[in-house]
């Protein structure tokens, strides 16, 4: 399995590309470099918001190019951010945090199948950019 980022513009790029353009660039790059024998690609979110990462994954899985690999997610921040925001370290918030985590897992499961249509709401925690300048792993 490979664990790359999607092909997205840099954080300071002024151009906003559509999910379909990101999908086409990502799948094209994979087709040029990844042998079909590789069983799957598990994408990192790369600082995208939770919703943006889900929408882009969905677009990748509906891209009209041949995709011989399973294309799914291996998100950290883009799977956990809403849950952590809801939890805030308080035991009383555990149920709300669990609900947020399950919701994001379900959304990303649908996106991995190319069946996610988007929430249409980028105003909540899921719509917040998760970009961290000079992030070190």
UniProtKB/Swiss-Prot annotation:
InterPro entries: Aldolase_TIM (IPR013785), FBA_I (IPR000741). Its EC number is 4.1.2.13. It catalyses: beta-D-fructose 1,6-bisphosphate = D-glyceraldehyde 3-phosphate + dihydroxyacetone phosphate. Keywords: Glycolysis, Lyase, Schiff base. GO terms for biological process: fructose 1,6-bisphosphate metabolic process; gluconeogenesis; glycolytic process. GO terms for cellular component: cytosol. Pathway: Carbohydrate degradation; glycolysis; D-glyceraldehyde 3-phosphate and glycerone phosphate from D-glucose: step 4/4. SUPFAM superfamilies: Aldolase. Homotetramer. PANTHER family: FRUCTOSE-BISPHOSPHATE ALDOLASE. Belongs to the class I fructose-bisphosphate aldolase family. In vertebrates, three forms of this ubiquitous glycolytic enzyme are found, aldolase A in muscle, aldolase B in liver and aldolase C in brain. This is Fructose-bisphosphate aldolase C. The gene is ALDOC.
């Amino acid at each position: 399995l490979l664990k790359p980022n999607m092909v997205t513009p840099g954080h300071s790029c002024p151009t906003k590309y559509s999910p379909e353009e990101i999908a086409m660039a990502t799948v094209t790059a994979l087709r040029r470099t990844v042998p079909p024998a590789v069983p799957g690609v598990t994408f990192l979110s790369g600082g995208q918001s939770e919703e943006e990462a889900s929408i882009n994954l969905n677009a990748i899985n509906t891209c009209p190019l041949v995709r011989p690999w399973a294309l799914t997610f291996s998100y950290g921040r883009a799977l956990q951010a809403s849950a952590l925001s809801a939890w805030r370290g308080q035991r009383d918030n555990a149920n709300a945090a669990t609900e947020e985590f399950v919701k994001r897992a379900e959304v990303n499961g649908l996106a991995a199948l190319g069946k996610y249509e988007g929430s249409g709401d980028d105003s909540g925690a899921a719509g917040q950019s998760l970009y961290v300048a000079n992030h070190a792993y």
